[in-house]
Amino acid sequence: MRMYETIFIVQPDLGEEELKGISARVQEVIVSMKGELKRLEDWGARKLAYPIEKFNRGRYYYLRFDGDAALIAELERRLRLNDKIIRYQSVKLEKEAPAAAAIPAKVTEEEPVEAAPEAKVETTTEEE
């Protein structure tokens, strides 16, 4: 299984019951497709960079989960069909990179570079 993250934006004027229903349906899709939900965060209502479907604000949700390509296809299909969700995006995460301290830095000593001599610029003016 691969790790994915999805951010989706719902309409800002939804009630708490509708928001709980949307997040429950998203969790249900992940579990039914044999995925493993790692994190579900409600980032709250934020101003959108540009109006989407005549909304200037939206409520953001963040998901991180393990799954396969079929899970992503089904999740995005369900997000697309829900009229209350105005945008979504899923990305596949790469494996965790080793910490920067674990990678030795390659130090090389270079000879100091001498400054280039200043170029003289001659200006000529023609008098007529």
From Swiss-Prot:
Biological processes per GO annotation: translation
Membrane-spanning residues: none
One cellular-component annotation, GO: cytosolic small ribosomal subunit
InterPro entries: Ribosomal_bS6 (IPR000529), Ribosomal_bS6_sf (IPR035980), Ribosomal_S6_plastid/chlpt (IPR020814), Transl_elong_EF1B/ribsomal_bS6 (IPR014717)
One Gene Ontology MF term: structural constituent of ribosome
Origin: domain of life: Bacteria
Residue spans of biased composition, Basic and acidic residues class: 117-128
Region (Disordered): 105-128
Keyword Transmembrane part of the UniProt annotation: no
Pfam family, one: Ribosomal_S6
UniProt entry keywords in alphabetical sequence: Ribonucleoprotein, Ribosomal protein, RNA-binding, rRNA-binding
UniProt keyword Ribosomal protein present: yes
Family: Belongs to the bacterial ribosomal protein bS6 family.
Job of this protein: Binds together with bS18 to 16S ribosomal RNA.
Designated name of the protein: Small ribosomal subunit protein bS6
Organism of this sequence: Geotalea daltonii (strain DSM 22248 / JCM 15807 / FRC-32) (Geobacter daltonii)
Gene giving rise to this polypeptide: rpsF
